[in-house]
UniProtKB/Swiss-Prot annotation:
Keyword annotations from UniProtKB, A to Z: Amino-acid biosynthesis, Cytoplasm, Diaminopimelate biosynthesis, Lysine biosynthesis, NAD, NADP, Oxidoreductase
Binding site for NADP(+): 35
Record protein name field: 4-hydroxy-tetrahydrodipicolinate reductase
UniProt source species: Vibrio campbellii (strain ATCC BAA-1116)
Leading EC class: oxidoreductase
Amino acid sequence: MVRIAIAGAAGRMGRNLVKASHLNPEASVTAGSERPESSLVGVDVGELCGEGKFDVFLTDDLTKEVDNFDVVIDFTAPVSTLANLELCKQHGKSIIIGTTGFSEEERELIDEAAKQVPVVMAPNYSVGVNLVFKLLEKAAKVMGDYCDIEIVEAHHRHKVDAPSGTAIGMGEAIAGAMGNKLSDVAVYAREGITGERTKDEIGFATIRAGDIVGEHTAMFADIGERVEITHKATDRMTFANGAVKAAVWLHSKPAGFYTMTDVLGLNEL
């Protein structure tokens, strides 16, 4: 049984992670944290997600619970995720990172930490999305040289970063399959007189509206035909279930940087 701590357990995603951990027969929720100013500190985490009492109470600092968990699942914000990563380094704990919006310097800190503790980091923990990443690699190898490639993503009005980590992950999968770095070919905004589209660019368009959980489409457009690969999420539990699956998988692994491709064995396809 893997003992799991949920960072940001009172948030929308946090509550789903608590529930997913509780429902997974190989996992147990043994700690949960929230910001010190939250009025929910001290509340039973089971009651937060509607699953009854767990006798596990929301803390304002996971350091207080460090003996009670094996793996942290963190879908919060870069600053708090890096603080929890440091905690894991100091105490030999594993961490699942679902937070997006890291700078290049922050990504380097994560890479360094992975030399000391096991880390899974992914822009999306849905099994379907990670299969899409693999399909995009194959499509890019077949069609990338002669098609225009565009990525469109849509999320709820509360999402604070753009484009989404998943959209960037799609772009990285496509660019990598074509032997490019995404930073060299990405175009994140178009406005005014932009001139004609260049051959190699990968364009991104972002929508923020309503309660959209997450929709992503990669378009390979040629003259006379267009291939679109789309994933639509309708429930955050799909991400939560994938993250808990990753936590169970990671618990037995040595220090290193892993992705959902490793968790799901997609490199074997």
